[in-house]
Curated annotation (Swiss-Prot):
It comes from Rahnella aquatilis (strain ATCC 33071 / DSM 4594 / JCM 1683 / NBRC 105701 / NCIMB 13365 / CIP 78.65). Optimum pH is 4.0-6.0. CDD domains: GH68. Disulfide bonds: none annotated. This is Levansucrase. It comes from the Bacteria. One of its GO terms (biological process) is carbohydrate utilization. The record marks 203 as: Transition state stabilizer.
Length: 415
């Protein structure tokens, strides 16, 4: 279908050594421990604003809509009560991934979110977990394609179509009752479960390339090959100073940002392409990749963790970015290292799962925040929105907004 001939860009160990966790221009401001919670009934984490295929965050008939990974808070479940009857929120929070469901919320203000409920009825999704993706408003009739990840057993990129309906009172969803599997890891470009039981393959983010008008998708993957078989050569190392050439067990880290191209704009058939960016020997996770198109350039963002860095490297939980003049690269790591917005060292787990929107606003969720008594408070709710400014290959934190502030960039009046 496509003659895209390109070589993946390598995020090198030398690049990652430049990560500076103490640079205030790339550090997310402190989240206070007295943060508000969206719901006492559910946890939320990965947030997916409704958008168009060019990345524009949209509202419908004046209603903003977000989709979230969601799990019930089991505060009355005996499984999560200790001997004194106290709720063990930490265990409940840590176990959320196994029961993740995609739900939706709506708002007139771009905050003050109202819970709408499940997107898909129980049993519609063919696997036990509904993991993150991207909801796309297709037209003024209110049709939505929700691209997401079907997980356990396996991991498959999929989509499900439904419709958004509005009234003066709120928003409802209809349809979303037939899931279409699109593709799984191929073992040629992207690692499969048989090659690595800890493989990553998820987080579809479709988009129209502003240059050629075709429909593409980026997603998280790992570079194909048996676990531990990857070689960290000169290209993966980059130009390293003395004392930094021992890679330890870095061969186990093989994250990449994958890409696929659709046969047509329906998005029903896809061809898997080589990765855009690889992180062999650097990091094992490049989650929730997504593009911002600005000034004729391609800003490719992803999120990653401190704990998924390879031996000899470190960096904060947060957003990492790469810049190119072309869709297929080559890409250069933003700010020299790739780090765009990281948690502060004093609160390394305060936020995660950032989504950079074309207006520079960055949404994320609160994970856990230290408290004055030396403990910590679990979040499971929206974090304060941060604005960053992109200037060529550099980025700067500029402002903090309210919790969960995700304003629309465009309002669509439905037919």
């Amino acid at each position: 279908m496509t003659n895209l001939n390109y070589t993946p860009t390598i995020w090198t160990r030398a690049d990652a050594l430049k990560v500076n966790e103490n640079d205030p221009t790339t550090t997310q401001p402190i989240v206070d421990a007295d943060f508000p919670v969206m719901s006492d009934e559910v946890f939320i984490w990965d947030t997916m604003p409704l958008r168009s295929l060019d990345g524009t965050v949209v509202s419908v008939d004046g209603w903003s809509v977000i989709f979230t990974l969601t799990a019930q808070r089991n505060n009355n479940n005996s499984e999560y009560l200790d001997a004194e009857g106290n709720y063990d929120i930490t265990s409940d929070w840590n176990n959320r991934h196994g029961r993740a469901r995609i739900c939706y919320w709506y708002s007139r203000t771009g905050k003050d979110w109202i819970f709408g409920g499940r997107v898909m009825a129980e049993g519609v999704s063919p696997t036990s977990r509904e993991w993150a993706g991207t909801p796309i408003l297709l037209n003024e009739d209110g049709d939505i394609d929700l691209y997401y990840t079907c997980v356990t057993p396996g991991a498959t990129i999929a989509k499900v179509r439904g419709k958004v309906l509005t009234s003066e009172e709120g928003v409802t969803l209809a349809g979303f009752n037939e899931v279409k599997s699109l593709f799984s890891a191929d073992g040629v470009y992207y690692q499969t479960e048989s090659q690595n039981p800890y493989w990553n393959f998820r987080d579809p983010s479709p988009f129209i390339d502003p240059h050629d008008g075709k429909l593409y998708m980026v997603f998280e993957g790992n570079v194909a090959g048996e676990r531990g078989s990857h070689v960290i050569g000169k290209q993966e190392m980059g130009t390293l100073p003395p004392g930094h050439r021992d890679v330890g067990n870095a061969r186990y880290q093989a994250g990449c940002i994958g890409m696929a191209v659709a046969k047509d704009l329906s998005g029903d058939e896809w061809e898997i392409l080589p990765p855009l960016v690889t992180a062999v020997g650097v990091n094992d996770q490049t989650e929730r990749p997504h593009f911002v198109f600005q000034d004729g350039k391609y800003y490719l963002f992803t999120i990653s963790h401190k704990f998924t860095y390879a031996d000899g490297l470190t960096g904060p939980d947060g957003v990492y970015g790469f810049l190119s003049d072309n869709l297929t690269g080559p890409y250069s790591p933003m700010n020299g290292s790739g780090l765009v917005l990281g948690n502060p060292p004093s609160q390394p787990f305060q936020t995660y799962s950032h989504c950079v929107m074309p207006n520079g606003l960055v949404t994320s969720f609160i994970d856990n925040v230290p408290t004055s008594d030396g403990n910590y408070r679990i979040g499971g709710t929206e974090a304060p929105t941060v604005k960053i400014v992109l200037k060529g290959n550099r980025s700067f934190v500029e402002r903090v907004f309210d919790y969960g502030y995700i304003p629309p960039m465009k309002n669509i009046i439905l037919n």
